[in-house]
């Protein structure tokens, strides 16, 4: 089918958002680039497992700091940043050699994660123990700034223009707005009780914040940083993800064992979908047709059709499935099973488990390069 292309005019902010979205998509959806490698943070054995997607085998096991929880891949795919909760370190690995090039001390804490700024020059790491964000120069591994934020920060999201970052603090009930040019807090926004997860809409207009203690989602206008609405959802909302087109946001409610579908045009919950026990993480297929939800308490995945707003399949996996990532080509989902010390591999065409790959103890964070 021939498609007619029409010229459109877009402003510099839109261009920045498109480029930022593209770089983020390539970092997290690398299937179109050819080789795919899965990285798993093994919290209980202080290692990172490297899995080759084609062979479905562990090709390397890398010793890192104590209690690794998350792995983040730089936009140029040259580095992996491993946040280690117990040793409070960030370990930086050169890829694909898997050599340790730097260890940044006192940089993170439990639940801490690293994200990369626009262009990939700097990484920003949350430190829940010290209530601050550590700024690291990616190429050198040098710590360049420490930004004090609210009490108990774990998540962080970068604005589409690369100029700001947003950090919810669970005990302060606020979201800190960071000026990344100056590495200071520009303002703080009230965001319900125990704000936990944050996500920015595809068009860059809205910031959503889950209030794990107030059972709602705070909608913040990005341009003004004003609270537009608080949307009631289920109990203990802990995870947020936008669909590819940005028309819907999906919220995992860990306390009520369901998923809320929010229509962004009306900013209302359009459907509430029951899932398994204690939903933990979710990822969408590249087409956006299905969302896969890990259920820690029932040891399975709920597969939800975004078109019908219903569970179409429940897939058994290992014990206490925590994080999930879908490969960029949409062929496989990889699930970190913290209780059985392995990775479940799901064929997304058949929606059937095809492999269980043994890794280290208590695998948690998982990502694809």
Spans of features found by a protein language model:
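Bacterial N-terminal signal peptides that target proteins for export
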Residues: 2-12
């Amino acid at each position: 089918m021939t498609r007619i292309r029409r010229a459109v005019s877009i402003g510099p902010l839109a261009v920045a958002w498109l480029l930022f979205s593209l770089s983020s998509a390539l970092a997290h959806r690398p299937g179109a680039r050819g080789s795919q490698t899965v990285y798993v943070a093994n919290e209980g054995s202080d290692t990172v497992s490297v899995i080759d997607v084609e062979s479905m085998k562990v090709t390397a096991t890398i010793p890192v700091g104590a209690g690794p929880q998350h792995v983040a891949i730089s936009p140029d795919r040259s580095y992996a940043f491993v946040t280690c909760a117990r040793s409070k370190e960030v370990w930086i690995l050169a890829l694909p050699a898997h050599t340790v090039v730097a260890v940044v001390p006192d940089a993170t804490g439990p639940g801490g994660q690293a994200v990369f700024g626009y262009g990939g020059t700097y990484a920003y790491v949350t430190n829940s123990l010290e209530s601050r964000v550590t700024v690291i120069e990616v190429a050198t591994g040098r710590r360049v700034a420490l930004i004090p934020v609210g009490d108990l920060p774990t998540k962080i999201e970068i604005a589409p223009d690369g100029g700001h970052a947003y950090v919810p603090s669970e005990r302060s009930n606020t979201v800190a707005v960071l000026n990344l040019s100056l590495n200071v807090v520009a303002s703080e926004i009230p965001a319900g009780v125990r704000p936990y997860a944050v996500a920015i809409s595809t068009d860059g207009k809205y910031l959503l914040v889950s209030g794990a203690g107030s059972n709602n989602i705070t909608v913040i206008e990005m341009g003004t940083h004003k609270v537009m609405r608080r949307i009631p959802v289920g109990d203990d909302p802990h995870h947020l993800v936008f669909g590819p087109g940005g028309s819907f946001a999906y919220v995992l409610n860990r306390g009520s064992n369901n998923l809320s579908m929010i229509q962004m045009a009306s900013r209302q919950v359009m459907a509430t979908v029951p899932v398994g026990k204690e939903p933990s993480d979710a990822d969408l297929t590249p087409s956006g047709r299905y969302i896969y939800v890990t259920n820690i308490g029932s040891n399975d995945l709920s597969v939800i059709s975004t078109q019908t707003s219903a569970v179409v399949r429940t897939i058994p996996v290992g014990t206490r499935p925590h994080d999930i990532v879908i490969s960029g080509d949409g062929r496989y989902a990889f699930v970190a099973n913290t209780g059985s010390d392995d990775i479940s591999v799901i064929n997304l065409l058949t929606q059937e488990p095809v492999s269980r790959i043994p890794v280290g103890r208590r695998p948690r964070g998982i990502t694809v390069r």
